[in-house]
């Protein structure tokens, strides 16, 4: 099993706790899109307690990657923080929740 597959298995397990019917193919694409950041223990997590990090997710992911407005991005990030209550929030799972919430799965098609 590759390092990527090991990480993906961890993210799949975390996502199944939130949504038993989750789209694992989409999670795989979101994870692939994050590149080498998933291998760094600091960058592969999201801290909902840090406003600057949430702003960065909104700007770099919601607005630039998914192409939504700042307001839509802010709402989706807040919704993901509410839904994903684990202390250590895996970035791929967090981004997956945002993508699904905004209905932007087509970005990864």
Where do the language-model regions lie?
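Core of compact, soluble alpha-helical bundle domains
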Residues: 2-67
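Short amphipathic alpha-helical segments and their helix-coil junctions
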Residues: 7-16, 69-86
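Residue-level detector of well-ordered alpha-helical segments, enriched
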Residues: 26, 30, 53, 72, ...
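Short, compact, well-ordered microdomains
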Residues: 75-109
């Amino acid at each position: 099993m590759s390092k990527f597959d090991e990480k993906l298995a961890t993210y799949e397990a975390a996502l199944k706790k939130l949504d038993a019917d989750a789209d694992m193919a989409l999670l795989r694409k979101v994870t692939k899109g994050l590149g080498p950041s998933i291998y760094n223990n600091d960058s592969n997590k999201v801290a909902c307690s840090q406003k600057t990090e949430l702003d960065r997710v909104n700007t770099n992911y919601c607005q630039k990657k998914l192409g939504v407005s700042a307001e839509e991005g802010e709402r989706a990030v807040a919704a993901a923080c509410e839904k994903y209550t684990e202390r250590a929030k895996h970035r791929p799972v967090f981004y997956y929740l945002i993508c699904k919430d905004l209905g932007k799965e087509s970005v990864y098609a």
